[in-house]
């Protein structure tokens, strides 16, 4: 995956798919905006869904500022709903910043096992199932159709990973030459 700065990277996947692990492995802490961390900042509990609205208000405000300042920003949230992605892409477009979608479409049994193993913030099984269904719907007509859909939403590039092996092989290339400004 090749990115420049400014740039927006949107992680897409169910709770337990490994978005935070990927984000922490590939990006610097100051490049991340995590919905879980912002929920924790608002309410003291990363799993408190009542804090979602104020957490995302902070996320959107901070994202807009960082993109306008010419930064690389990674949004670590499920982003399985098109409306959620649309709000992020609007901010990127306003700052004239390209966006990359990273879709983590791992097997459901692996995602459920990871979610169950979370000691800090397990997500209800029904919620994980909804997330998995959204990701499956995105990929229901194959990779090429998913790429077309995400390009149509406004993503400049798309990465789809379907296994732990593909996640492990995911690499980041920082290239000033791909910057849009």
Task: Set out the residue ranges of the language-model regions.
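Conserved GTP-binding G-domain of TRAFAC-class P-loop NTPases and closely related GTPase folds
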Residues: 2-12, 17, 25, 29, ...
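Conserved substrate/cofactor phosphate-moiety recognition/catalytic segment
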Residues: 17-71, 80, 110-112
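Short, hinge-like loop/turn segments at secondary-structure boundaries
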Residues: 48-53, 92-93, 118-121
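Aromatic/hydrophobic pocket-lining residues that form π-stacking "cages" and hydrophobic walls in ligand
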Residues: 62, 88-90
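Short glycine-/polar-rich loops that comprise or flank the Walker A/P-loop
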Residues: 69-70, 95-100, 143-144, 153-157
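Short catalytic-loop micro-motif centered on adjacent basic/acidic residues
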Residues: 73-76, 101
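Acidic, metal-coordinating catalytic cores used for nucleic-acid/nucleotide bond scission
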Residues: 76-85
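Conserved phosphate-donor/acceptor-positioning beta-strand/loop module used by diverse small-molecule
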Residues: 95-114
